[in-house]
Amino acid sequence: DNTPWLFKAPGGESMRHVFERMQMTVDAIVRANPGRVIAAASHGCAIRNYLCYALGWPLERIADVCWCDNTAVSLIEFDGGFRPHPVYLNDASHLPEHASTFATQSWWRQGAEHAASAVK
């Protein structure tokens, strides 16, 4: 599908709702903890939605956000106005290859080179 931003699981929330929910939730957490280091964990779809927002992109660019390996780490700093500034995204260098969920899969590589270059 060439329009992942229009996806809505039957009986579930729309991609737009996930995008907005993640934005509001992370914003509330950051505002409640100014100047503190925060660790948050979620599932891939929610993470990609937030990274799309943090990069300053509209939801329609969700396909440009790379998929991440399980336990990948992204670092996002927030300025005084609580605006996100990604430092790095989807770092899985701590994983040995045998522990990587992506090492033996290829479905996620489709367009990965394009998405990686979009962040630079």
Task: Give the residues covered by each predicted segment.
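Short glycine/proline- and acidic residue-enriched helix-loop micro-motifs
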Residues: 1-17, 110-116
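Amphipathic, non-transmembrane alpha-helical scaffold segments
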Residues: 15, 19-23, 66
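Short, well-ordered beta-to-alpha junction loops that form the rim of enzyme active sites
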Residues: 22, 41-45, 89
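A generic secondary-structure signal
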Residues: 24-32
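Generic beta-sheet signal
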Residues: 29, 36-44
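Acidic, low-complexity terminal tails and accessory targeting/binding regions
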Residues: 31, 36, 52-120
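Glycine-rich phosphate-binding loops at beta-strand->alpha-helix junctions
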Residues: 46-50
